Amino acid sequence: RSLNLTGAFGKLHNCAWVGNQPIELDWLRANEIVLKLSGKYPNIDMVDKFPRFLQHIIAADNTRILETSKVRMGAQLAAGTTVMPGAAYVNFNAGTLGSVMVEGRISSSAVVGAGSDVGGGASILGVLSGTDGVPVTIGENTLLGANSCTGTAIGDGCILDAGVTILPGTKIALSEKAVAALKEIN
């Protein structure tokens, strides 16, 4: 987290992106009719502040990104990371620290440890989406089940089951029987 794009989001303007070329929206609006009548209106891929990751970065060896729109410029993907199509997404200032399977969303400033799996539709909240500006770290060899959601750090070797949400204020209670079972296996 020593190099980051904190504050960039507020300073950058939305642009129309045609491939890796940004075009100012005000210029497009001012020239729209002339461009359309001359057949030169661009085929716009997206409107955003950041380009797509693969438009400017060559992914590390053994890294797979199955849809170019799923990783934003400013993300960091370690070698061996796989970003699947569908609900997968990695935002700027976010990324992986080793081989990670990404089938869910890694929001801004969230970091996922090696060997972890962000299950289909799972969400890791970012500094722009519900963490009060505190970056979330997911430990190594951790599973975030399908459609789970976390807005707080989770350590190594944890499982957040499918559909479960855990936030900084979430209270967790264990029965005496569950505590005894945990003591037995630990």
Regions found by a protein language model. Name each.
Residues 1-59:
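Terminal amphipathic alpha-helical/low-complexity segments used for targeting or macromolecular assembly
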Residues 2-6, 12, 30-32, 37, ...:
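Proteins with a high burden of low-complexity, intrinsically disordered sequence enriched in S/T/G/P/A and R
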Residues 24-39, 120-128, 147-152, 156, ...:
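Short, Lys/Arg-enriched charge-dense amphipathic segments
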Residues 47-54, 62, 68, 74, ...:
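Generic secondary-structure boundary/loop-capping signal
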Residues 55-64, 133-135:
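Short, positively charged
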Residues 63, 69-71, 75-77, 81-90, ...:
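A structural motif detector for beta-strand N-caps
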Residues 131-135, 140-143, 149, 165, ...:
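C-terminal segments of enzyme domains that contribute to small-molecule binding surfaces
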